[in-house]
Amino acid sequence: MRYLIFVFLFLSHTIQAQLKKNDLEPNFTERKKNLLIIESSAYSLALVGLNQLWYKNYKKSSFHFINDNNSWLQMDKFGHLTTSYFVGVLGIKTYQWAGFSRKQSIWIGGLTGTFFQSAVEILDGFSDEWGASTGDLIANSLGSMFAISQQLHWNEQKIQLKFSFYPSKISNTNTELFGKNIIQKSLKDYNGQTYWLCLNLEDVFNTNSNLLPKWLNFAFGYGADNMYSDANNDSREIGERQFFLSLDINTDKLNISNKFVKNVINLIGFIKLPMPTVEYSKGKLNFHNLYY
């Protein structure tokens, strides 16, 4: 989950870019310049910071790839995909705000997640402890293309990828692996993470029946539990996959007049809200009054 350092820095510069001014007549030339400076600075600082904080004490090696596609029942891959998607959506909005053309905003902004996360893979590739993951690179690209393709086709994100977390029952069995506090656990405890695909069926299929409000989405989730190790888990030996059906709120469809509040809500829009949920796992159906 080291790539999340990039996400936090990107969120930081996005907040600065979008909330710093509220010009009636925006200076797009200045906005473009400021955006590129902030983004370049965030990228450089993250690389230096990661190298000092994470890689410094490990041996270097020649660049190499690894195959970790069986680890954590692919939960880490869903993490890469969802993060790349969300950073791409923020990138599109930020480049639009800065005055770039529609196609430039979609392609350059949409690829921001892949660009930032791929830098981590390069550092991994030169580390003897890890290695560049082809699965991670593919997941990064798919997340970006999911954001880009929707923006090109619909000019909005009708189908959203989201994230939710609640500490798993086994998170305290190995605090070095799963984290010592709630922030660390939210990044490292794959057993407590759930990744969601959220959509409004009427909106996607253009039925215009008005049976459901535009802000109410159906949410289809994927998670896994009882994974005690990061060593290429085999689904036949350890861990159980979980599938969920729930509801969600599309914050983009809420009628919020306050621009500051709207921007802040959009910045945390990747979080799936607690809702009644049906879970299928171990061959059984379970109902949760509220699942997060």
Regions found by a protein language model. Name each.
Residues L4-K77, L81-F100, Q157, T207-P213, ...:
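N-terminal targeting leaders of membrane proteins
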Residues A42-Y43, S105-G125, S141-S144:
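Small-polar-interrupted transmembrane alpha-helices in polytopic inner-membrane proteins
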Residues H80-V87, D124-Q151, F243-F244:
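Alpha-helical transmembrane segments that form the membrane-embedded catalytic/substrate-binding core
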Residues T112, F116, I159-L161, K214-F220, ...:
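Transmembrane beta-strands of outer-membrane beta-barrel proteins
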Residues T134-G192:
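Glycine- and acidic-residue-rich phosphate-binding/metal-coordinating active-site segment common to enzymes
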Residues M145-F146, Y195-L201, L245-T251, F287-N289:
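Residues on the lipid-exposed face of transmembrane beta-strands in outer-membrane beta-barrel proteins
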Residues F165-K169, Y222-Y228, T251-K253:
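Transmembrane beta-strands of outer-membrane beta-barrel pores
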Residues T175-D225:
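A conserved mid-domain beta-alpha-beta active-site/ligand-binding segment of alpha/beta enzyme cores
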